[in-house]
């Protein structure tokens, strides 16, 4: 249990930030699933459009520090390869 006022405040902040980060991770997973679903459907135009949106989401989350930039790059690369394979 936090004893000082500073420690109590940091505990409150960490709870709030944890919830926010969880919502960002959920948005990330949803974006990736949308791309994979479009790829499985075989719709190249839709897959490219959804991929562009997912890249924005992934980059935004990496910029905020929720994920490491290398993790973001890895996911973008793998999604891009799947979209390009539809040709």
Swiss-Prot record:
Binds directly to 16S ribosomal RNA. This is Small ribosomal subunit protein bS20. Residues 7-19 have a biased composition (Basic residues). The keyword Glycoprotein does not apply. The gene is rpsT. It comes from Neisseria meningitidis serogroup B (strain ATCC BAA-335 / MC58). GO terms for cellular component: cytosol; small ribosomal subunit. The keyword rRNA-binding applies. Belongs to the bacterial ribosomal protein bS20 family. InterPro entries: Ribosomal_bS20, Ribosomal_bS20_sf. It comes from the Bacteria. Residues 1-22 are annotated as: Disordered. Keywords: Ribonucleoprotein, Ribosomal protein, RNA-binding, rRNA-binding. GO terms for molecular function: small ribosomal subunit rRNA binding; structural constituent of ribosome. Gene3D superfamilies: Ribosomal protein S20. One of its GO terms (biological process) is translation.
């Amino acid at each position: 249990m936090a004893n000082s006022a500073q420690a109590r405040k940091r505990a409150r902040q960490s709870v709030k930030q944890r919830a926010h980060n969880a919502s960002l991770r959920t948005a990330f997973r949803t974006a990736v699933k949308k791309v994979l679903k479009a790829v499985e459907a075989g719709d190249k135009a839709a897959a490219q459009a959804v991929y562009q949106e997912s890249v924005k989401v992934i980059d935004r989350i990496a910029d905020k520090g929720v994920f490491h930039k290398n993790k973001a790059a890895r996911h973008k690369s793998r999604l891009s390869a799947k979209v390009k394979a539809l040709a």
